[in-house]
Amino acid sequence: RYMRVKMIVAYDGTNYCGWQIQPNGITIEQVLNEHLSRLLKEDIKVTGASRTDAGVHSLGNVCMFDTNTRMPAEKISYALNQKLPEDIVVVDSCEVSDDFHPRFSKSRKTYEYRILNARFRNPTRRLDTYFYHYPLDTEKMSEAAKYLIGEHDFASFCSANSQAQTTVRTIYDCTVSKAGDIITIRVTGNGFLYNMVRIIAGTLVKIGGSDMPADAIKGIIAATDRAAAGPTAPAHGLTMIGLKLSLIHI
């Protein structure tokens, strides 16, 4: 009897070349496959909901795999966490129905991009926060963020080497908040294009640190041209907070 197992995985992406297996570096997917295969004594291949880029962190990526093991699904996380490197943790594991698939599910994904806006670096936040020392107008950034909400063609916010069939996405919420020296850009959407959240962050930083008006975002969206938006903010400031999946029955 085989079962399908869903896992929620948190990781510090600093030392990894992203989620997806690739020939020239170690990835989260590869580490999970190796440890699961060893633990369950069979060849395991996980499928992730979100293929985060190199250096990007996660508090709740979702993946699944099929197995013939007799080990109860909820015990797998405990057994795995004893063997995994300290920068990867399986937060939860459970059995799911055969029609569950993280890629073909409707999802709401939430990302946070964190900026340390201060005169000096903070060495304790260097791995998960982008240091930017020029003053930023968070009120204006917050106002600009509201224009991103809704269904739009986000071609301006997509890296040129994206393989997406369509650049239309829906953003449900986009906020900018400040606590102390840390500015947090929080974005929830139904899916994101390649580097989209980092380009949104870079564009909001450009608006917040210049005399560009908040509603410049409208023109940037309308241009559907990557050159119209701001720079791609560095990967290490980005954390995938989590995602909610609901099944689409095909």
Question: Which residue stretches match the model-derived regions?
Answer:
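Structured-RNA-binding interfaces characteristic of tRNA pseudouridine synthases
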Residues: 2-247
